[in-house]
Amino acid sequence: MSEEFIAVSTLARNLEIAKGNEFHTILATLRSPVYINEQLLKSELSFLVTKILKLIRSGNDFDLWKGCHTSVVTCAYNPLVLSTHGGQLLAAIYSRLEQKTGFYSSVISSSHGKQLFNTLISSVAIIIDLMKNKPTLSREALVPKLKAIIPTLITLSQYEPELVLPVLQRILKRNTTTFKPFTNKFRTVLINLIISDYASLGTKTQRLVCENFAYLHLLKIQVSDTSDDETQAHHKIYADSNWRTGLMSILSQFKPIIQLCGEILDFEQDNELYKLIKSLPVIDESNNKEEFLPSLKLDFNAPLTLWEIPQRLSLLADMLVAFISLPTPFPIRVPLGGINSLCEVLLGVSNKYLPLKKELRHDNELNGVINTILPQIQFQGIRLWEIMVSKYGKCGLSFFEGILSSIELFIPLKKKSNNEIDFNVVGSLKFEFATVFRLVNMILSHLGHQLNIISVISQLIEVALFLSHDKTLIDSLFKNRKSIMKQQTKTKQSKRSKSAEGAFSDIYTHPELFVCKNSMNWFNEINDFFITALNNWILPSTPHIQILKYSITQSLRLKERFGYIPESFVNLLRCEVLHPGSERVSILPIAISLLKNINDDMFELLCHPKVPVGMVYQLHKPLDLGEDGEVRDDINKKEVETNESSSNANTGLETLKALENLENVTIPEPKHEVPKVVDDTAIFKKRSVEEVIERESTSSHKKVKFVEETTVDNGEELIVKKAVSQTKEEEKPMEDSEDEEQEEFEIPAIELSDDEEEEEEEE
């Protein structure tokens, strides 16, 4: 530890006047471990804490802001300050937060007031987190102050839910007993947020509201003795009884909403779906306290009111997701079968196979709203399935094939067509299909090769390929350009047409600027789906070629855009090389050219296959044969010499006779190795017979062509090279040796004179 450092008292004196970079330098200096010293605790560090408390209690908002940040830094990096003065600093910050909350409307009117609220809340949260799990500090400094901090945070959560709800959620999870007196107050605040302001909240804040509502069920409900049944007293009480009560209450509120959809679609046409709807859980009258949502007000004369159906289902799905996905201090019982049945019912609410009610008034506005809300109702089932599969994995393995079959209902088809996908509707459901592909990827990772190729996979491939293209917003404008021009000529409004031309000039001159490009997260999900499909199935030729085209073109575009090919596309190219399917042409050369700057071991091995070196050098390892081995070597050498001498003696006469008739004969030099000859006389006899037959068949030709004939000219004279070898193949049958010799090598035809033939007969 360095002995020379800035005194804490010096830093404390400069805190009041420090601004900007000077204040940042002081905070960075206080993080040094040299100040963690008991000798400094009573004098220097106590003086620093006094200055910090002075800043926090100051009426100046900037001094308050500096005091909050300084207290957080010193408590986080100096355990001595946290242990001795942490409770004092927390109480000071909380008191200022309580004061500011009383004047919330006036404080929040300025921009720095919003930032000050954010700083106060985050400072309280950080110091609480620093004190947790420290027994003495938590018992003596934190818990007594939480009873005063929690009411203020609950009040403030009505105005700043995004800032306060994470803090309350951690307190509710860790200090459940301390939070118990304030449960009803917090429940009221959450219900007001759900009923009145839920649709106007952001996605993150909506999730926080639902999670806090679920964590309220960690507290056990004290049931009065009058309502208890003495006959049920012997039953086991589970730790998650209150949690399960809340879960089942939310789950049972889906059925009335789905029954309202029965006024739009005729459920009686599908008996299985009708029975499944009846089997859904119903709200128990004894648990009416859990039902706090108001009833829906729908009017078919005002079709836009039908949008309340998917909005209510989305709210219930968010709350159910919180109950089945949040971590709890005890194991919980989740009705996976009931949730799966609910999702099947939601996916079945579709006009794909169910007709509309005959009593409905069929007008364009009502039909348009119905066609829009039905996919959103189905999407809530897909969301629940995604959470169930991601959290519980193979626990729902028995449901996976049914899930894939139900997903097919979500893919829109054109009316009065033979399973032709309606890509116009698909384009408007891009966000929903991203969730579908995440769900399918998780399911296929558990199933894989157990599945045969099914229609839903082929349809999802078509959807993925369509959505992988960048969406051009002005395609419809160009398609209807002629009709627009005709309308303009009929109206003859010159001034409006000129202004319209000026407004539309960018559309016609720079159409590439009106394009919605896909994100990398979308490409990653699509590529994972394609990789799974290629690994597990042999796709038909058309979709397989389309996937190849997609991977190559998008890789080139992204390489030009980012300077490199993303990892998901590298994995897709590797998968396409390893699984070519029924295609005969491999994309290996294209993939290598795209990934030439990437040292990929797989592509390197495919281009330059190598035998493991460790297996090669052992093949030629010399063996120590000893004296017996040397004797065997001598015997083998002698046998080879005798075989060579006998073979030379047998072929000597024929070679001399062939040398006398070399005037018009070209002697071949064989291109391959000389075959192993067993009996030369048999070959000469066979060759002479073949030569006679060939002369008779080719008498009309001027030249006789012999197979593998070459002229060997070595200076002044011709030299015939004849190599004969005798090996172990003498033991093979004569017929096999003749066939092999005929295929590998042919002896040139040699014409003998009549005198020489007579001499042979006399001999």
UniProtKB/Swiss-Prot annotation:
Residues covered by region (Interaction with MDN1): 663-763
Intrachain S-S bonds: none
Subcellular localization(s) per the UniProt record: Nucleus
Residue span of region Interaction with IPI3: 2-233
Entry-annotated residues carrying N-acetylserine: 2
Keyword Acetylation: yes
GO CC list: cytosol; nucleoplasm; nucleus; rixosome complex
MF GO annotations: chromatin binding
Pfam family, one: RIX1
Keyword Ubl conjugation: yes
Disordered: annotated span: 722-763
Keyword terms of this UniProt record: Acetylation, Nucleus, Ribosome biogenesis, rRNA processing, Ubl conjugation
Major subcellular site: nucleus
Biased composition (Acidic residues): 736-763
Matching InterPro entries: RIX1_N
An annotated GO BP: rRNA processing
Modifications the protein undergoes after translation, according to the UniProt entry: Sumoylated.
Subunit structure and binding partners: Component of the RIX1 complex, composed of IPI1, RIX1/IPI2 and IPI3 in a 1:2:2 stoichiometry. The complex interacts (via RIX1) with MDN1 (via its hexameric AAA ATPase ring) and the pre-60S ribosome particles. Interacts with NUG1. Interacts with IPI3.
Job description of the protein: Component of the RIX1 complex required for processing of ITS2 sequences from 35S pre-rRNA and the nucleoplasmic transit of the pre-60S ribosomal subunits. Regulates pre-60S association of the critical remodeling factor MDN1.
Note: Present with 7820 molecules/cell in log phase SD medium.
Entry similarity comment: Belongs to the RIX1/PELP1 family.
Protein name per the record: Pre-rRNA-processing protein RIX1
Naturally occurring in which organism (per UniProt): Saccharomyces cerevisiae (strain ATCC 204508 / S288c) (Baker's yeast)
Gene name of the record: RIX1
